[in-house]
Design a protein with these regions (language model features):
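An acidic-aromatic substrate-binding cleft motif
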Residues: 121, 128-184, 188
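Aromatic-rich carbohydrate-binding modules that target alpha-glucans
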Residues: 22, 29-75, 84-107
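Short, solvent-exposed loop/turn segments at secondary-structure junctions
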Residues: 35, 158-161, 192-193
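Core domains of carbohydrate- and sulfate-ester-processing enzymes
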Residues: 83-141
Length: 207
């Protein structure tokens, strides 16, 4: 039996997706109008719906949201939205997902330490987020971008350009591109796509 829905607007300015409030608290928000009930399930609750993870609904009945605390700083978590006790969905604004049908084709050199899929606990695509994600500090602060009229662009697909299929090998190949007179590279779509063989022009999810 579903509990009563709490109708309440999320904090002003909250965006859809996951918003990290601090290193142990996250706010989840899903745009899903005309739905009866939405639960948040994931690594943090054994992938089981409960009243604690029954999401609040905005006053206009379009956004479902919930604040989850007690998360471990620096930890990676998988999650889904369970809609009306029937179907489980990954977050459409995910920046990283787990695919039970294709992740086994991705080697550890391409994606080290991939978050494990919760086999036996759920089905379908799973969204992944990390509390206190690492930040990147630019090392080359003196880089000057070439003028547009001077660009010599090489478009490439990492998977096909280097046999190791990873960015570090591409970085190690920059000198070769420089010898060719290339001063810019354009990566073919480096985002999530359906299946496991694609040039990236059939995007799936946000990233």
């Amino acid at each position: 039996v579903n509990p009563p829905i709490t109708y309440q607007n999320p904090p002003v300015g909250t965006k859809n997706g996951v918003t990290l409030l601090n290193d142990s608290t996250a706010l989840f928000q899903l745009y899903a109008p005309e739905k009866d009930h939405v639960y948040l399930v994931g690594d943090f609750n054994g992938w089981l719906p409960s009243g604690t993870y029954h999401m609040n609904c905005s006053l206009d009945s379009t956004r479902w949201w919930l604040v989850v605390g007690g998360l471990s700083p620096g930890q990676t978590y998988g999650y889904q939205y369970l809609i009306t006790n029937q179907a489980r969905y990954a977050d459409p604004l995910s920046t990283l997902i787990l695919d039970p049908n294709n992740d086994n084709f991705v080697g550890n050199t391409t994606f080290p330490n991939m978050h494990p899929y919760p086999t036996g606990l759920t089905t379908g695509f799973v969204s992944v987020f990390q509390t206190t994600p690492p930040t990147y500090t630019w090392l080359n602060t003196g880089f000057n971008r070439p003028a547009k009229k001077d660009l010599v662009i090489y478009e490439l697909l990492v998977r096909d350009f280097v046999s190791a299929r990873n960015y570090q090998t591409l970085i190690d190949t920059i000198a070769y591109l420089d010898r060719l007179g290339i001063n810019a590279i354009e990566l073919m779509p480096n985002l999530e796509f359906e299946g496991n063989q694609s040039w990236g022009y059939n995007p799936s999810f946000h990233m």
